[in-house]
């Protein structure tokens, strides 16, 4: 059960990282096509914050719970 939970947490965090990386790529390749985000830099910073959040979760799981 423990390993299943750890795998699920890691998969969830990795999936969210990929989602936010894809969003950043969209901003880089087509910044004019995003109407609701007039401040592209701020929007990218928010995406990077989310990537950092989930990467931190992965790092903590590996450091403290993965055996």
Where are these regions (language model features)?
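Extended, charge-rich alpha-helical interface modules
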Residues: 1-67
């Amino acid at each position: 059960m423990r390993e299943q939970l750890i795998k699920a947490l890691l998969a969830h965090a990795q999936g969210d990282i990929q989602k936010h990386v894809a969003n950043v790529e969209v901003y880089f390749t087509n910044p004019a096509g995003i109407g609701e985000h007039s401040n592209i830099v701020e929007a990218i910073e928010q995406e990077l914050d989310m990537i950092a959040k989930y990467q931190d979760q992965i790092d903590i799981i590996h450091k403290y719970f993965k055996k």
